[in-house]
Amino acid sequence: MNCAIIGSTKIAEVHAEQLVKNGVREITFISRSEKRRKKIISKVKKKINKKVFFFHSDIKILKKNFFNIICICSNTEIHHKHLRIVSGLKSIIIIEKPIISLLKLKNRYESYLKNLYKKNKRIVVCYPYLFLAKSFKKFCRNLKKIDRIIFEFQTGGTAKFEKICINLMPHALSFFHIFFKKNFLKKNINKTNPIVKKHIWQTSFKVSEKVINLVFKENYKKKTSVKLKLNDLVLVRKTKKNRSKFINYIQNYQTNKTQNINNPMEEFYKDLFKNMNNKEYYKINKKLTLNIMKKNNFFLN
């Protein structure tokens, strides 16, 4: 099985590692910069001890060669351009969230996505926080009693102002889609005006008698972490490095105990490869994506 990865950033490295773990043995990195393509191949080779063939090229390779999987890890602002190029191909398309930039397409995003899904029925948007939510949920015995929630998400990203919301809201919405009942995204929401700063985007909203505060932060100098406060219970997801392996864990601030959890990205890829030939899997991801984009647009406007 072979794969083309569009992009040469850190997230492209992460996807490459997971693809190799699931049996991909030939990867072509696609980028305008030959220097960046060679650099990312060098980095990935150091992390992988399996026999994998690496190649690199520009975007034109997609018209010449067939790839079983095409993974889009480019800047969100140009997702729509890359999707236009690959949508008519017979490859499975994996794309980093959000599927497209709402600031770029604005009110045209719905018609764009409608036409996109007509051309390719095997598009999967990467939502690892579906699986992170399952890990957090194990700490909460009675969700009905929870009426105050704070979801604080900090990353080492570089997005600023409204772009922080576009970048991180899909994580939060997919998280609550699993954490609460699956009709969460369809419920009516009463929101407050957001507070938008250079490195912070935050808002609060009420849904089903629960008040939820969202606090998104992006700062390239900070490590990624997720803090979930449920009434008086405070849970934080962190990572630590043990030799060459990253360990994911949740810390309970009430008991000061920690519990290791599965890597959400690993869980996403296991689920993807398990359902690669399952038509219903792609339909569910499509429905989730359309609901997330609709709610994200609601919070922006």
Show where each model-derived region lies.
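A contiguous active-site-proximal alpha/beta segment in oxidoreductase catalytic domains
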Residues: 100-157
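Rossmann-like dinucleotide-binding domain that binds NAD(P)(H)
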Residues: 154-223, 287
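Conserved acidic residues
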Residues: 27, 68, 147
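C-terminal helix-rich "cap/oligomerization" subdomain common to oxidoreductases
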Residues: 30, 38, 42-47, 69-74, ...
